């Protein structure tokens, strides 16, 4: 059938393209007549068939497609038809679900894999199946369980039902019970049986299996049911539920012996309650949940709570768990000190730190080469300022050896003096701190030995310049500070302590560690008498007492803490002498460095 334009209809090999071309053609030709039947009169048969074929490829039935097309018309948009088909399909599915409501689950279900599952199951059963697949198959020794429940006198079939229901409640689906077939016979007074109908019910559910037996010449021939039990459990990698140890079967095969030792689940009956142990393989074995699973769950390694609770007197040696105690390493102080000593990095020697600074010998040689003829003799000045040959190379030397005063044209300027003072004192204090507490006292004695050795010699008096006159009593007379004192001749050389405090016109220091700027010096012909360095009232006496006290505190703390921790904390807090406060700081310092 041809269209109004005289062209042939679109090939049916591509229904999607034909559907869209038909829609475009109908939209371009004009509006449809509302008084005509959209299916019978307007749309050709081939067009209707193409649409039906198209939607059938999407999975819808012909009846559904025809009903929707009769409702919407052939000219309806594809998305509209699809939306109506989806609604129609969902309504049909709801009607089918309402008609096929799931029946209540019976108390006893067949073993997994023996019979096909019915199609009308609850939605939660797939999760139960997945849960049951993680559980081991269970093989129950029916004779042993029934006789145990009957107190070794009666074959109580109710005991078998209690055991089966216990495993069903835990999610097991693969359960097998073995019972000799002669137990189906009528009970006799010498062989009492109770609730014999339970055996037939369990057999109908494909849970109970009768082992074969027969009569030969009026005598019963019974097959060994224990071999059925062990063999099935071994082949299915399951669990045997019995209080029998199967000693005769353990001797038959070595793999059976090991299997029975590892997979035998014993039990007890408390009236009508089936109770297997929570630790089937002993206190140190797996739990009952892991014992019945193919892949055991990850266990929480947590200690058993201490039975004494807060009244426990074992302290950190208690092997039980104490929830009231904070989570800290349960080790003694000695063990912690040993562990910290092994973990702490080795300390670098002091000579490595001193090697980073320029050598004093190179400084003295460079100064002496720059000296002019009219200035001080460089060699003589270096010899006077050096502490002596016995101190060279010593690791505890605090004062720089071989250091000489800067010489420039026979006089000192403020720039040269500032550079010299900044290069001398900070090295002394820093290296003494690095060498430990015990070296502070030796540092003081060595410094006083350099200065002249006599108790009556001059000492420091002014605070800002107290550490700047290590050359005061040793430097000979020479022309000094010619830019500031042109009228002064070769007089007595004075050290920075002889100068007046800096006037307010000098700029303030940018950093607190910088020395004060020096003003023009005043002529000093003779140094005044100052108190001896050993006097208790002077600052040097106070420093000596402080060093002795710090040495005592250091010795006490080293008896408790590692020496490197004590040194590190005492370097942080040089003015702190309270042992308790220092101990607290050491503990906090140790915890910070251990966490790093």
UniProtKB/Swiss-Prot annotation:
Q: In which tissues is it expressed?
A: Expressed in CD4(+) helper T-cells (at protein level). Highly expressed in macrophages. Expressed in lung, lymph nodes, spleen and thymus. Expressed weakly in heart. Expressed weakly in cardiomyocytes (at protein level). Expressed in spleen, lung, intestine, brown adipose tissue and thymus. Weakly expressed in the heart. Weakly expressed in cardiomyocytes.
Q: Which residues form the RNase NYN domain?
A: 135-290
Gene null: resulting phenotype: Most mice die within the first 12 weeks. Show severe inflammatory syndromes, including growth retardation, splenomegaly and lymphoadenopathy. show systemic inflammation characterized by T-cell and B-cell activation. Exhibit greatly increased levels of plasma cells and infiltration of plasma cells into the lungs. Show elevated serum immunoglobulin levels and produce anti-nuclear autoantibodies.
Show the segment(s) annotated as Necessary for interaction with TANK: 81-150
Superkingdom of origin organism: Eukaryota
Q: Impact of altering residue 435 to A?
A: Reduces its phosphorylation status, does not interact with IKBKB/IKKB and BTRC, inhibits IL6 mRNA instability and IKK-mediated degradation of ZC3H12A
UniProt xrefs under InterPro entries: Rege-1_UBA-like, Regnase_1/ZC3H12_C, RNase_Zc3h12_NYN, ZC3H12/N4BP1_RNase_Reg
Gene3D superfamilies associated with the record = 3.40.50.11980
ZnF locations on chain (C3H1-type) = 301-324
> What ranges does the record give for the region RNase, renumbered to this chain?
112-281
**Positions of the UniProt region annotated as RNA binding:** 214-220
Q: What is its EC number?
A: 3.1.-.-
Which parts of this chain are annotated as the region Disordered?
A: 1-48, 97-134, 278-306, 340-417, 511-543
Comp. bias (Low complexity):
356-368, 524-533
UniProt entry keywords in alphabetical sequence: Angiogenesis, Apoptosis, Cytoplasm, Developmental protein, Differentiation, DNA damage, DNA-binding, Endonuclease, Endoplasmic reticulum, Hydrolase, Immunity, Inflammatory response, Magnesium, Membrane, Metal-binding, Neurogenesis, Nuclease, Nucleus, Phosphoprotein, RNA-binding, Stress response, Ubl conjugation, Ubl conjugation pathway, Zinc, Zinc-finger
Function comment:
Endoribonuclease involved in various biological functions such as cellular inflammatory response and immune homeostasis, glial differentiation of neuroprogenitor cells, cell death of cardiomyocytes, adipogenesis and angiogenesis. Functions as an endoribonuclease involved in mRNA decay. Modulates the inflammatory response by promoting the degradation of a set of translationally active cytokine-induced inflammation-related mRNAs, such as IL6 and IL12B, during the early phase of inflammation.
Q: What is this protein called?
A: Endoribonuclease ZC3H12A
Species of origin? Mus musculus (Mouse)
Originating gene = Zc3h12a
């Amino acid at each position: 059938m041809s269209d109004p334009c005289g062209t042939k209809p679109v090939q049916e090999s591509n229904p999607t393209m034909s559907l869209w071309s038909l829609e475009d053609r109908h939209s371009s030709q004009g509006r449809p007549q509302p008084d005509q039947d959209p299916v019978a009169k307007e749309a050709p048969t081939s067009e209707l068939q193409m649409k039906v074929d198209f939607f059938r490829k999407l999975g819808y039935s012909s009846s559904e497609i025809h009903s929707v097309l009769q409702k919407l018309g052939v000219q309806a948009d594809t998305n509209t038809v699809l939306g109506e088909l989806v609604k129609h399909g969902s309504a049909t599915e709801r009607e089918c679900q309402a008609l096929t409501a799931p029946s209540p689950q019976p108390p006893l279900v067949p073993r997994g894999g023996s019979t096909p599952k019915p199609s009308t199951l609850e939605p939660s059963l797939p999760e139960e199946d997945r849960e049951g697949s993680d559980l081991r198959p269970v093989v129950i020794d029916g004779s042993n369980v029934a006789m145990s429940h009957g107190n070794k006198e009666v074959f109580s079939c109710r005991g078998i039902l209690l055991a089966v229901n216990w495993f069903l409640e835990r999610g097991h689906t693969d359960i097998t019970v073995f019972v000799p077939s002669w137990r189906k016979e009528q009970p006799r007074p010498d062989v009492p049986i109770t609730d014999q109908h339970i055996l037939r019910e369990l057999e109908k559910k494909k849970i109970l299996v009768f082992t074969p037996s027969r009569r030969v010449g009026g005598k019963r021939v019974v097959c060994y049911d224990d071999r059925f039990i062990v063999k099935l459990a071994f082949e299915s990698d399951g669990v045997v539920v019995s209080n029998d140890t199967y000693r005769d079967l353990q001797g038959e095969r070595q793999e059976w012996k090991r299997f029975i030792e590892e997979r035998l689940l014993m039990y007890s009956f408390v009236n009508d309650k089936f109770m297997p142990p929570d630790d089937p393989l002993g206190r140190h074995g797996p739990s009952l949940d892991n014992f019945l699973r193919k892949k055991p769950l990850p266990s929480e390694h947590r200690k058993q709570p201490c039975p004494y609770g807060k009244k426990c007197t074992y302290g950190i040696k208690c092997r039980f768990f104490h929830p009231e105690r904070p989570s800290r390493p349960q080790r003694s102080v000695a063990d912690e000190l040993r562990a910290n000593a092994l973990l702490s990095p080795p300390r670098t020697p002091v000579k490595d730190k001193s090697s980073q600074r320029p050598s004093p010998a190179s400084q003295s040689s460079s100064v002496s080469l720059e000296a002019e003829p009219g200035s001080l003799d460089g060699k003589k000045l270096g010899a006077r300022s050096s502490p002596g040959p016995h101190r060279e190379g010593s690791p505890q030397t605090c004062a720089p050896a071989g250091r000489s005063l800067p010489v420039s044209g026979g006089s000192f300027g403020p720039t040269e003096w500032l550079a010299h003072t900044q290069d001398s004192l900070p090295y002394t204090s820093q290296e003494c701190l690095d060498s430990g507490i015990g070296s502070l006292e030796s540092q003081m004695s060595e410094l006083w030995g350099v200065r002249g050795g006599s108790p009556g010699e001059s000492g420091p008096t002014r605070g800002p310049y107290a550490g700047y006159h290590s050359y005061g009593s040793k430097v000979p007379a020479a022309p000094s500070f010619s830019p500031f004192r042109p009228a002064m001749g070769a007089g007595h050389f004075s050290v920075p302590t002889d100068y007046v405090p800096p006037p307010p016109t000098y700029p303030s220091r940018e950093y607190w560690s910088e020395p004060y700027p020096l003003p023009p010096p005043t002529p000093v012909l003779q140094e005044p008498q100052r108190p001896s360095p050993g006097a208790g009232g002077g600052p040097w006496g106070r420093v000596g007492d402080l060093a002795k006290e710090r040495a005592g505190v250091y010795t006490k703390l080293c008896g408790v803490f590692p020496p490197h921790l004590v040194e590190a904390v005492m370097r942080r807090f040089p003015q702190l002498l309270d042992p308790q406060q220092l101990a607290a700081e050491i503990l906090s310092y140790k915890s910070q460095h251990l966490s790093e």
